Design a protein with these regions (language model features):
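Beta-lactam-recognizing serine transpeptidase/beta-lactamase-like catalytic domain environment
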Residues: 1-49, 54-182
């Protein structure tokens, strides 16, 4: 990396010899974009279990769960005819309290928690946490999270969202939302 020429490609070995000028220019553009891409703001991903802290925060705030609540995990649940597995498939985690369900990252427990919240409340929290748009960070190229409209009415969508699947967020938006929980 040359501080005086930040747009220069630092890994010239990746540029193959024998290319036409057009091919070389295209390859250089691709390498430059890869070199400067900020994945924390430019890319989105499904947060998976890293989202469970937000589901738990929503449920605690709304008094939908108590620390004394218990959950049974047989290794899967069926929602609207779709079988959703836990990370620990049958026989599952079995009987567990809230803290253990969180520690086990138990999908059926978090589906149960999400269903207690309901679609409208869950979606409103996603908006409040800033997960349906851009964070507004002062830089270019920030991507927006992607939340399907089906979260507003589909029990299956809610079940999947509760453990961080079927929607996309940027890493910076997820971190900002998680920081709001602390």
């Amino acid at each position: 990396y040359d501080l005086n020429a930040p747009a220069s490609i630092y890994n010239k070995e990746m540029l193959a010899a024998g290319m036409t000028d057009e091919e070389l220019a295209a390859a250089a553009d691709t390498l430059q974009n890869m070199q400067w891409r900020n994945k924390a703001i430019n890319d989105t991903f499904q947060p998976g279990s890293t989202f469970k802290i937000l589901t738990l925060a929503m449920a605690l705030e709304e008094n939908k769960v108590k620390m004394s609540d218990t959950f049974n995990c047989p290794g899967y649940v069926v929602i609207e005819g779709a079988k959703i597995n836990c990370s620990k498939r049958a026989p599952g985690h079995g009987h567990q309290d809230l803290i253990t369900a969180f520690a086990n990252s138990c999908n059926p427990a978090f589906i149960n928690i999400g269903l207690r919240l309901g679609n409208t409340t869950f979606y409103n929290y996603m908006k409040a946490f800033g997960l349906t748009g851009k964070t507004g960070v002062d830089t270019t190229g920030e991507a927006s999270g992607f939340v399907n409209k089906e979260i507003e009415y589909s029990t299956l969508a809610l079940a999947c969202y509760a453990f961080g699947q079927n929607f996309n967020v940027t890493p910076i938006a997820l971190l900002a939302a998680q920081c709001a929980c602390v």
